Amino acid sequence: MTGGEGSFMLRFVLPTENDRDAVLSFYNEVEKSGGECIGFRYRNDYDRWLSDMRNRHAGKDLPQGYVREDFYICYDGADVVGVFSLKFELTDYLLNYGGHVGYAVRPSRRCEGIATRILAEGMNIARRSGFERLLCICDDDNYASEKVIIKNGGVLENTLYDPDEKVTVKRYWIGL
Protein backbone atom coordinates (compact mmCIF):
# COMPACT_ATOMS: atom_id res chain seq x y z
CA MET A 1 0.00 0.00 0.00
CA THR A 2 1.51 3.26 -1.07
CA GLY A 3 0.70 6.89 -1.46
CA GLY A 4 2.76 9.87 -2.46
CA GLU A 5 2.90 13.45 -1.26
CA GLY A 6 5.81 15.79 -1.01
CA SER A 7 9.14 14.11 -0.62
CA PHE A 8 8.08 10.76 0.80
CA MET A 9 6.32 7.61 -0.37
CA LEU A 10 4.74 5.48 2.34
CA ARG A 11 4.64 1.70 2.20
CA PHE A 12 2.71 -0.25 4.87
CA VAL A 13 3.84 -3.80 5.69
CA LEU A 14 3.03 -6.34 8.35
CA PRO A 15 6.33 -6.97 10.18
CA THR A 16 8.59 -9.93 9.34
CA GLU A 17 12.06 -11.09 10.31
CA ASN A 18 13.42 -8.94 7.47
CA ASP A 19 12.26 -5.77 9.24
CA ARG A 20 14.30 -6.40 12.41
CA ASP A 21 17.04 -3.76 11.94
CA ALA A 22 14.72 -1.06 10.62
CA VAL A 23 12.15 -1.62 13.38
CA LEU A 24 14.78 -1.65 16.13
CA SER A 25 16.31 1.54 14.73
CA PHE A 26 12.87 3.20 14.79
CA TYR A 27 12.11 2.19 18.37
CA ASN A 28 15.63 3.08 19.56
CA GLU A 29 15.19 6.59 18.19
CA VAL A 30 11.82 6.91 19.91
CA GLU A 31 13.32 5.75 23.19
CA LYS A 32 16.35 8.07 22.91
CA SER A 33 14.01 11.01 22.33
CA GLY A 34 12.44 10.27 25.71
CA GLY A 35 9.18 9.13 24.20
CA GLU A 36 7.10 6.03 24.32
CA CYS A 37 5.54 4.34 21.35
CA ILE A 38 2.70 1.98 20.62
CA GLY A 39 3.39 -1.61 19.83
CA PHE A 40 6.79 -2.44 21.30
CA ARG A 41 6.43 -4.35 24.54
CA TYR A 42 9.54 -6.52 24.17
CA ARG A 43 12.30 -4.01 23.44
CA ASN A 44 15.09 -6.53 23.98
CA ASP A 45 13.49 -9.46 22.15
CA TYR A 46 12.46 -8.82 18.54
CA ASP A 47 11.52 -12.46 17.95
CA ARG A 48 9.10 -12.40 20.89
CA TRP A 49 7.69 -9.07 19.68
CA LEU A 50 7.21 -10.46 16.16
CA SER A 51 5.46 -13.54 17.54
CA ASP A 52 3.20 -11.24 19.59
CA MET A 53 2.35 -9.17 16.48
CA ARG A 54 1.52 -12.34 14.51
CA ASN A 55 -0.72 -13.58 17.31
CA ARG A 56 -2.51 -10.24 17.42
CA HIS A 57 -3.00 -10.38 13.64
CA ALA A 58 -4.46 -13.90 13.94
CA GLY A 59 -6.43 -13.03 17.08
CA LYS A 60 -4.94 -15.97 19.00
CA ASP A 61 -3.23 -16.37 22.37
CA LEU A 62 -4.02 -12.76 23.24
CA PRO A 63 -3.46 -11.44 26.75
CA GLN A 64 -6.63 -10.61 28.66
CA GLY A 65 -8.15 -7.36 27.44
CA TYR A 66 -6.41 -7.50 24.05
CA VAL A 67 -8.26 -7.81 20.73
CA ARG A 68 -7.39 -8.79 17.18
CA GLU A 69 -5.11 -6.11 15.77
CA ASP A 70 -3.14 -5.49 12.59
CA PHE A 71 0.11 -3.68 13.25
CA TYR A 72 1.86 -2.10 10.27
CA ILE A 73 5.38 -0.84 9.82
CA CYS A 74 5.37 2.31 7.67
CA TYR A 75 8.37 2.73 5.40
CA ASP A 76 9.67 5.62 3.36
CA GLY A 77 12.24 3.91 1.17
CA ALA A 78 14.35 1.68 3.47
CA ASP A 79 13.56 3.65 6.63
CA VAL A 80 10.76 3.01 9.09
CA VAL A 81 9.12 6.41 9.52
CA GLY A 82 6.14 5.29 11.55
CA VAL A 83 3.80 2.58 12.74
CA PHE A 84 0.04 2.09 12.52
CA SER A 85 -2.27 -0.16 14.52
CA LEU A 86 -5.85 -1.13 13.68
CA LYS A 87 -7.92 -2.92 16.32
CA PHE A 88 -10.87 -4.93 15.03
CA GLU A 89 -13.16 -4.61 18.05
CA LEU A 90 -13.60 -2.34 21.01
CA THR A 91 -13.56 -3.54 24.59
CA ASP A 92 -15.09 -1.19 27.14
CA TYR A 93 -11.63 0.21 27.82
CA LEU A 94 -10.85 0.75 24.12
CA LEU A 95 -14.28 2.30 23.55
CA ASN A 96 -13.63 4.86 26.25
CA TYR A 97 -9.87 5.43 26.23
CA GLY A 98 -8.09 3.59 23.38
CA GLY A 99 -10.01 3.59 20.12
CA HIS A 100 -9.56 1.54 16.97
CA VAL A 101 -6.29 3.09 15.83
CA GLY A 102 -2.88 4.03 17.04
CA TYR A 103 -0.02 5.58 15.12
CA ALA A 104 3.39 7.08 15.75
CA VAL A 105 6.05 8.85 13.71
CA ARG A 106 9.82 8.59 13.98
CA PRO A 107 11.02 11.64 15.99
CA SER A 108 13.45 12.80 13.28
CA ARG A 109 10.63 12.74 10.70
CA ARG A 110 7.96 14.64 12.59
CA CYS A 111 6.37 17.82 11.17
CA GLU A 112 6.50 16.46 7.60
CA GLY A 113 2.84 15.43 7.31
CA ILE A 114 3.68 11.76 7.80
CA ALA A 115 1.20 11.20 10.67
CA THR A 116 -1.62 12.68 8.59
CA ARG A 117 -0.73 10.36 5.72
CA ILE A 118 -0.38 7.33 8.02
CA LEU A 119 -3.87 7.87 9.41
CA ALA A 120 -5.31 8.50 5.92
CA GLU A 121 -3.84 5.24 4.61
CA GLY A 122 -4.94 3.49 7.81
CA MET A 123 -8.47 4.68 7.07
CA ASN A 124 -8.23 3.06 3.62
CA ILE A 125 -7.09 -0.20 5.23
CA ALA A 126 -9.99 -0.04 7.69
CA ARG A 127 -12.48 0.67 4.88
CA ARG A 128 -11.22 -2.34 2.91
CA SER A 129 -11.55 -4.41 6.11
CA GLY A 130 -15.24 -3.54 6.40
CA PHE A 131 -15.18 -0.68 8.91
CA GLU A 132 -17.76 2.08 8.45
CA ARG A 133 -16.21 4.41 11.00
CA LEU A 134 -13.19 4.61 13.28
CA LEU A 135 -12.78 5.79 16.83
CA CYS A 136 -9.58 7.82 17.26
CA ILE A 137 -8.56 8.92 20.73
CA CYS A 138 -5.78 11.24 21.84
CA ASP A 139 -4.71 12.79 25.11
CA ASP A 140 -6.27 16.22 25.52
CA ASP A 141 -2.83 17.86 25.46
CA ASN A 142 -1.61 16.00 22.35
CA TYR A 143 -2.30 18.84 19.94
CA ALA A 144 -0.32 17.27 17.09
CA SER A 145 -2.39 14.08 17.14
CA GLU A 146 -5.61 16.05 17.52
CA LYS A 147 -4.69 18.07 14.41
CA VAL A 148 -4.00 14.84 12.46
CA ILE A 149 -7.36 13.37 13.47
CA ILE A 150 -9.26 16.54 12.54
CA LYS A 151 -7.44 16.80 9.17
CA ASN A 152 -8.68 13.28 8.44
CA GLY A 153 -12.30 14.15 9.21
CA GLY A 154 -12.47 13.43 12.93
CA VAL A 155 -15.54 14.76 14.74
CA LEU A 156 -15.19 15.26 18.49
CA GLU A 157 -17.74 13.24 20.46
CA ASN A 158 -16.56 14.02 23.99
CA THR A 159 -13.72 14.03 26.50
CA LEU A 160 -13.29 11.46 29.26
CA TYR A 161 -10.94 11.11 32.20
CA ASP A 162 -8.92 7.86 32.20
CA PRO A 163 -8.40 7.02 35.88
CA ASP A 164 -5.79 4.32 35.10
CA GLU A 165 -3.53 6.64 33.11
CA LYS A 166 -4.62 9.76 35.02
CA VAL A 167 -5.20 11.70 31.81
CA THR A 168 -8.13 13.26 29.99
CA VAL A 169 -8.67 11.99 26.46
CA LYS A 170 -10.54 13.37 23.46
CA ARG A 171 -12.71 10.89 21.54
CA TYR A 172 -13.16 11.48 17.79
CA TRP A 173 -15.14 9.49 15.24
CA ILE A 174 -14.15 9.38 11.57
CA GLY A 175 -16.70 8.19 9.02
CA LEU A 176 -15.29 6.06 6.24
Positions of PLM-derived features:
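Conserved G/P- and acidic residue-centered "switch" motifs that form tight phosphate/ATP-binding loops
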Residues: 113, 130, 142
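Conserved acetyl-CoA-binding loop-helix of GNAT-fold acetyltransferases
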Residues: 102-105, 111-124, 147-151
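Conserved beta-strand-loop-alpha-helix junction that forms the acyl-donor binding cleft
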Residues: 110, 136-146
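GNAT-family acyltransferases
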Residues: 2-100, 125, 169-176
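Conserved catalytic-core motifs of GNAT/GCN5-like acyltransferases
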Residues: 137-138, 153-171
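Structural motif
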Residues: 129, 151-152
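Short coil/turn motifs at secondary-structure junctions
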Residues: 89-91, 108, 141
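Conserved GNAT acetyl-CoA-binding A-motif
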Residues: 126-137
